[in-house]
Amino acid sequence: IGDGCPGGENIEILWQCGKYYKAGTDEFMAKAKAEGLGGNTLKFIHYSDFIGRMDLAYAMADVVISRSGASTVSELCAAHKAAVFVPSPNVAEDHQTHNAMALVRKDAAMLVKDAEAQEKLLAAAISLVNDNERLEAMQKNIAKLALTNAAGDIAEYAYKLIEKQ
């Protein structure tokens, strides 16, 4: 952000920073603005500790940068949103990396390791936003992974099990 995000001059960022990081984010943004960091970039960053209508946030997004918990991965598949996943290193059995890699292998998402995020994440996201062909391919590929009738499928399977008894 400090260098003005080359290539991202017209990208709007909606950032859910979380309640534990809100004060630090406020401090960072205030300091960056006071020191003139980021040029015009900071005016395109909108942040909050919590987004109450994630469906609307997904609807307006071209690319989503996110951790890769199972619920989030499912939501992004259903929303047909290209994603750059940053798996949390603080979860059991590194399951978020496994979740993300399932999509990366299908060219439906990108992965940036948490330890490399500060160095590589912004460039990866900006590159994806500015590559319409890759972005569209990822959106199509992630859409193919959506299980849009999962609840109905589970219910149908349960009924079949009941009928067998």
Which functions belong to the PLM regions below?
Residues I1-V64, T97-A100, V112-L121:
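Donor-nucleotide binding loops and adjacent catalytic segments primarily
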Residues K19-Y20, S88-A92, A143-K144:
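Short histidine/acidic/glycine/proline-rich micro-motifs that form metal-
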Residues M54-Q96:
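A donor-sugar binding/catalytic signature common to diverse glycosyltransferases
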Residues A125, V129-N132, I154, A158:
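Hydrophobic "lid"/C-terminal helical patch
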Residues T148-Q165:
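C-terminal alpha-helical cap of glycosyltransferases
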